[in-house]
Amino acid sequence: MESGGRPSLCQFILLGTTSVVTAALYSVYRQKARVSQELKGAKKVHLGEDLKSILSEAPGKCVPYAVIEGAVRSVKETLNSQFVENCKGVIQRLTLQEHKMVWNRTTHLWNDCSKIIHQRTNTVPFDLVPHEDGVDVAVRVLKPLDSVDLGLETVYEKFHPSIQSFTDVIGHYISGERPKGIQETEEMLKVGATLTGVGELVLDNNSVRLQPPKQGMQYYLSSQDFDSLLQRQESSVRLWKVLALVFGFATCATLFFILRKQYLQRQERLRLKQMQEEFQEHEAQLLSRAKPEDRESLKSACVVCLSSFKSCVFLECGHVCSCTECYRALPEPKKCPICRQAITRVIPLYNS
């Protein structure tokens, strides 16, 4: 706390930082809680022969936010894995990721770093069909890459380490980057895999479509069942809630500390002001009662004992209010009787 009771710059920065972090965490928590509530409110629809009749009776022949589960089936052609035999799917994602170590000039340590240098995703049209045989119904899945939880399975993964010569090693130390290698990954959504879709379910021209929902709700195509998906969202909500509460408590504690310091500083100023007024009032009463020839000596009297002459100048406040004996009798740490500031130096006052 600075002089005058004003908070210091560090306290302002701490309060501002915790407030901004708390607001950001609370915003994320609200967004996660909204997504969780929307998932809880999604209507579970059974993928069966009565699906079209259910949708035809729904307003606008659609369910705005529905949950449906089925097996993946390609419409026409399928995608073959480039590395695994007899592995067919409807979505294929190939990724090349570079791994390297970068020298940190601040910590003087080598830090692991990775970045995707190439990624390609191939898709073909596919449906969700019932697991049971003999049920003639299918749901066409539209825009699968727009989903926030695309349930791809890693079918191939290989790390290709970098081959380095002695001159390469020296060059890497000079440049501050040491390549470790390239990681090659293939992910696929296999034919026959179980998929849980959460989105807008629409009946259009006797065909059923699952597409991204409107009104800002999230689109899911997950390999997990709906209960596991909901549980994961609720766990995320609890985590962000705890983080928001922790930083909120830190913000409140910082604010309480600053306000308490200001309150104590204000109370101290009021007490010193009251003490000074009492000194002045007491001195005025003595002057009014004294004889004219004694008034000059009273004006120069020590405010503590009122018997000796003032003989000390207190620094840094500059008050002249005490005799030498009363100054010596002040308790440690010595403070000015008028303003209660710490006495750093005393200059003797010589009365003529």
Curated annotation (Swiss-Prot):
GO terms for biological process: apoptotic process; cellular response to exogenous dsRNA; mitochondrial fission; mitochondrion localization; negative regulation of chemokine (C-C motif) ligand 5 production; negative regulation of defense response to virus by host; negative regulation of innate immune response; negative regulation of mitochondrial fusion. InterPro entries: MDM2_MDM4_MUL1, MUL1-like, Znf_RING, Znf_RING/FYVE/PHD. Ubiquitinated by PRKN during mitophagy, leading to its degradation and enhancement of mitophagy. Deubiquitinated by USP30. It catalyses: S-ubiquitinyl-[E2 ubiquitin-conjugating enzyme]-L-cysteine + [acceptor protein]-L-lysine = [E2 ubiquitin-conjugating enzyme]-L-cysteine + N(6)-ubiquitinyl-[acceptor protein]-L-lysine. Residues 1-8, 260-352 are cytoplasmic. GO terms for cellular component: axon; membrane; mitochondrial outer membrane; mitochondrion; neuronal cell body; peroxisome. Changing residue 261 to A: Protein is targeted to the ER. It is a multi-pass membrane protein. The keyword Transmembrane helix applies. Changing residue 260 to A: Protein is targeted to the ER. Pfam families: GIDE (PF12483), zf-C3HC4_3 (PF13920). The keyword Cytoplasm does not apply. Homooligomer. Interacts with MAP3K7/TAK1. Interacts with UBC9. Interacts with and sumoylates DNM1L. Interacts with MAVS. Interacts with TP53 (via N-terminus); the interaction leads to ubiquitination and proteasomal degradation of TP53. Exhibits weak E3 ubiquitin-protein ligase activity. E3 ubiquitin ligases accept ubiquitin from an E2 ubiquitin-conjugating enzyme in the form of a thioester and then directly transfer the ubiquitin to targeted substrates. Can ubiquitinate AKT1 preferentially at 'Lys-284' involving 'Lys-48'-linked polyubiquitination and seems to be involved in regulation of Akt signaling by targeting phosphorylated Akt to proteasomal degradation. This is Mitochondrial ubiquitin ligase activator of NFKB 1. It comes from Homo sapiens (Human).
